[in-house]
């Protein structure tokens, strides 16, 4: 598996995911503001990967002698929906106040993330049957984490258990994480995969070509989850055709204090929708709504696969 990020000589290197799958290139982060830029521009994306990157951003700030509380607030503002970002910054601040170095905390967090994801894969494998076709939306794989992945980690674990599985990836407009990243990961692992446009998900379910749906999450609350835009549409189709709909996410993605509809839904630039490969597909002055996430309510969710086991939504 290609590394999403790595720490070397007191520098953080982020795989530039905006250039995948055609170019593998790492961006060097020398300052915490470099990390913020990497998060905002989606060079690094996926809730767990954002959290680990944020921890390393805090480490760079500490090495530079910055005020940790101030830079913590700056890093938290990079992307408001992913709860792991807030969790990681708060964890670093807490452990630094107890005498640990931010670098050590970040390194430990990176290692823990991979171990947690493998545990999620282990539990998730128990719900995968031989010859299953699994539909997934966006990218909740190794590229969205420090390694292995959550939703794709479950698929990876089933493949490692020699189960015969087929994967369907939604393209995931407008940034195409499914087409560019999830398909790329499956091809790297030689896991059979088909790419479909987002609007075809319901059609595939209606035809009986989907056995299970597994997605990741950027925030899990007691009454639902926030995930990449289009997840709700997939969940509604799965409910209509009685297809199990699972969410795979670490406990660090859980928000126990707020309702899911209190989530701040990030609005991204119109150009993501208006342009493909730098070319406008609609007039530049077209009004655009570009929410990055939507809400899947708990009654649409069969189970939430975590490192602690498979939890029933409340």
From Swiss-Prot:
It is an enzyme of class 5 (isomerase). Coiled coil: none annotated. Substrate binds at residues 45-47, 79, 177, 227-228. InterPro entries: IF-2B-related (IPR000649), IF-M1Pi (IPR005251), IF_2B-like_C (IPR042529), Initiation_fac_2B_a/b/d (IPR011559), M1Pi_N (IPR027363), NagB/RpiA_transferase-like (IPR037171). The active site is at residue 218. GO terms for molecular function: S-methyl-5-thioribose-1-phosphate isomerase activity. It comes from the Archaea. It catalyses: 5-(methylsulfanyl)-alpha-D-ribose 1-phosphate = 5-(methylsulfanyl)-D-ribulose 1-phosphate. Its EC number is 5.3.1.23. HAMAP family: Salvage_MtnA. Belongs to the eIF-2B alpha/beta/delta subunits family. MtnA subfamily. This is Putative methylthioribose-1-phosphate isomerase.
């Amino acid at each position: 598996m290609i590394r999403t990020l790595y720490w070397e000589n007191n520098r953080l290197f982020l795989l530039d995911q905006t250039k995948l799958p055609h170019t593998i290139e790492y961006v060097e982060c020398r300052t915490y503001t470099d990390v913020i830029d990497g998060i905002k521009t989606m060079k690094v994306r996926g809730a767990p990967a954002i959290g680990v990157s944020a921890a390393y951003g805090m480490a760079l700030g500490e090495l530079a002698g910055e005020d940790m509380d101030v830079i913590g607030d700056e890093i938290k503002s990079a992307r408001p929906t992913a709860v792991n970002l807030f969790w990681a910054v708060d964890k670093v601040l807490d452990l630094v106040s107890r005498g640990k170095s931010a670098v050590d905390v970040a390194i430990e967090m990176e290692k823990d993330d991979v171990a947690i994801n493998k545990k999620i894969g282990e539990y998730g494998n128990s719900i995968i049957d031989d010859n299953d076709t699994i539909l997934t939306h966006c990218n909740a794989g190794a590229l969205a984490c420090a390694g292995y992945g959550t939703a794709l980690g479950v698929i990876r674990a089933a493949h490692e258990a020699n189960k015969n599985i087929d994967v369907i990836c939604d393209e995931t407009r407008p940034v195409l994480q499914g087409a560019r990243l999830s398909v790329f990961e499956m091809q790297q692992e030689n896991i059979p995969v088909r790419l479909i446009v987002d609007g075809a998900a319901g059609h595939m379910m209606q035809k009986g070509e989907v056995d299970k749906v597994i997605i990741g999450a950027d925030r899990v609350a007691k009454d639902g989850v926030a995930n990449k835009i289009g997840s709700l549409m997939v969940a509604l189709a799965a409910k209509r055709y009685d297809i199990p709909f699972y969410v795979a996410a670490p406990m660090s993605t859980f928000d126990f204090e707020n309702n899911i509809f209190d989530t701040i839904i990030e609005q991204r630039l119109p150009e993501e929708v208006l342009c493909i490969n730098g070319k406008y597909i609609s007039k530049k002055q077209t009004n655009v709504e570009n929410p990055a996430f939507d809400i899947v309510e708990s009654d649409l969710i069969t189970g939430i696969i975590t490192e602690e086991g498979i939890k029933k939504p409340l």
